[in-house]
């Protein structure tokens, strides 16, 4: 199992090292300020811990039989350089464990708080800020892998006496297999309906089991990993735990913003102030 730690390296050096050693492959696109992320393994799990007060950010990356520990000083040239937006070759999940994460999606900027989650299909351009204090889990799943998860889920749904309500996460995975929707830019906003700590208590055992299975990859691990992912996606798509909003990023800016505001007001039962909306959406209160 390969391990490495990167300290204050340049962007070029980082790309070169990752391309040589890492299942996460980052390439610069022809367009300026844009990168493309690909993965060479069925899935990648990343845990990002940012501590601005301690001037560092740790990225722990797990994939089958592979582990990387990347450390960035927040005062380094790499950390201070504006991150280019990127696009994935696969679906990406972001779940905020603690603190808040600022996410740039196209020309919009949003803040996700602890307990909130977003799922993006492969056509969404975005980037996260390495700033503030937060901890978040990122899951990247190849198309072939999600297809297997979907097949298993649909088989269970077909044979159970009480099928579940529509799971929007598995629906997004199904849409990725649909050629007529291959160019749609869709992501899901997931806001907790119950206390974030209660959700994390249920998710943490699955996150831990997934990481342990990944770094101790052995016979049967692929089956166990699929089972854990299926349970994770079922929980994240549970309508009793999350209010999930399906958003098309190619909507006009005002329509896109309206969808976000509507979802926030719905999940907060109308108790979100204009100042709180300013913080979450990075817009002037008068404009909102």
Residue ranges and their predicted role:
Residues 67-178:
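N-terminal regulatory/effector-sensing and dimerization cores
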Residues 157-228:
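Amphipathic alpha-helical segments enriched in hydrophobic/aromatic residues interleaved with Lys/Arg
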């Amino acid at each position: 199992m390969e391990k490495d730690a990167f300290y204050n390296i340049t962007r070029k050096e980082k790309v070169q090292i990752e391309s040589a050693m890492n299942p996460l492959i980052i390439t610069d696109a022809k367009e300026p300020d844009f990168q493309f992320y690909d993965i060479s393994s069925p899935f990648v799990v990343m845990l990002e811990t940012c501590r601005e007060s301690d001037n560092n950010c740790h990225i722990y990356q797990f994939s089958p039989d592979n582990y990387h520990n990347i450390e960035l000083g927040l005062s380094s040239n790499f950390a201070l350089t504006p991150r280019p937006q990127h696009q994935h070759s696969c679906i990406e999940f972001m779940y905020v464990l603690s603190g808040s994460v600022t996410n740039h999606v196209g020309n919009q900027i949003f803040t996700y708080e602890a307990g909130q989650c977003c799922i993006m299909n492969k056509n969404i351009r975005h980037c996260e800020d390495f700033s503030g204090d937060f901890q978040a889990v990122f899951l990247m799943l190849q198309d072939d892998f999600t297809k297997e998860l979907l097949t298993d889920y649909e088989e269970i749904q077909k044979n159970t006496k009480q099928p579940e309500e529509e799971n929007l996460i598995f629906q997004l995975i199904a849409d990725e297999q649909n050629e007529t929707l291959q160019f749609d830019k869709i992501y899901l906003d997931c806001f907790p309906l119950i206390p974030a700590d209660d959700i994390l208590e249920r998710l943490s055992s699955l996150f831990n089991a997934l990481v342990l299975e990944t770094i101790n990859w052995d016979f049967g691990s692929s089956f166990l990993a699929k089972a854990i992912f299926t349970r994770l996606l079922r929980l994240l798509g549970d309508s009793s735990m999350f209010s999930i909003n399906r958003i098309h990023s190619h909507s006009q800016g005002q329509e896109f913003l309206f969808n976000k505001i509507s979802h926030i007001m719905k999940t907060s039962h109308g108790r979100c102030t204009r100042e709180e909306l300013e913080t979450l959406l990075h817009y002037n209160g008068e404009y909102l």
